């Protein structure tokens, strides 16, 4: 190949590489926009009433909710007190060595805040967002529930809603806007990167990322 031919091939390769980088950047930018956009939407005010409020689990410390889990629970309890739905569903299993589960911790906290035990259901085996939502879908079907409000952190909402819709749940989102996971730009960027990776994996495989158990992924 002549030097001019090599130069031409190099320019083509550079152009293709540049186009690939621009395309990847555009996809990443749009995905980031969608994560943030969904997190700023609260569907609860436009619902006359729902059949259930589901709280996505997060870390717990021997029965004490982490600040992130507490923020989610407080928001869900406020929705329940406002008459948005007749019962709560707390979710999340436990990790090896845990004395209890995220769901049980959430249930006890809600009872302490005045929610009757009869108004709380639990999904206590899920170790990822998807596993919890699959179990929740079965609970909702057994109860004949329709419209369901899902509560989690803002940047978690897009993935929650996508999986719920794929499970044919009549899902509506209501993010906990005062979560510590959203308190600083560094935390927001960390959560955004986590969600982009988890969404990409789910889109490619239809399964939760293999290294994302509930307590690690939803601290």
What positions do the PLM features span?
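Short linear elements at protein peripheries
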Residues: 50, 209-219
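A transmembrane-helix-recognition feature enriched in membrane-embedded lipid enzymes
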Residues: 185-211
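Solvent-exposed, charged interface segments at domain starts and junctions
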Residues: 1, 9-12, 89, 136, ...
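N-terminal membrane-anchoring alpha-helices
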Residues: 1-48, 217
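Serine/threonine-rich low-complexity intrinsically disordered regions
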Residues: 7-8, 116, 184, 209
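A structural signal for short, hydrophobic/glycine-enriched beta-strand patches
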Residues: 31-193
């Amino acid at each position: 190949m002549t030097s001019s031919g090599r130069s031409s091939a190099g320019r083509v390769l550079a152009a293709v590489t540049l186009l690939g980088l621009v395309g990847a950047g555009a996809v990443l930018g749009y995905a980031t926009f969608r994560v943030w956009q969904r997190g700023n939407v609260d569907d609860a005010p436009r619902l006359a009433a729902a059949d259930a409020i589901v709280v996505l689990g997060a870390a717990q410390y021997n029965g004490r909710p982490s600040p992130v889990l507490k923020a989610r629970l407080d928001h869900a309890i406020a929705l329940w007190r406002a008459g948005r739905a007749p019962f709560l569903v707390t979710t999340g299993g436990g990790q090896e060595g845990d004395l209890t589960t995220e769901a049980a911790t959430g249930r006890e906290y809600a009872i302490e805040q005045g929610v009757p035990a009869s108004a709380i259901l639990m999904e206590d085996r899920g170790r990822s967002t998807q596993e919890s939502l699959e179990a929740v879908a079965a609970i909702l079907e057994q109860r004949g529930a329709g419209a369901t409000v899902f509560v989690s952190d803002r940047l978690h909402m897009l993935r929650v809603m996508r999986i719920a819709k794929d499970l044919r749940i009549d899902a509506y989102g209501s993010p906990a806007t005062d979560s510590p996971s959203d308190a600083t730009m560094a935390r927001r960027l960390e959560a955004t990167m986590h969600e982009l990776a988890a969404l990409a994996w789910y889109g490619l495989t239809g399964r939760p990322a293999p290294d994302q158990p509930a307590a690690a992924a939803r601290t």
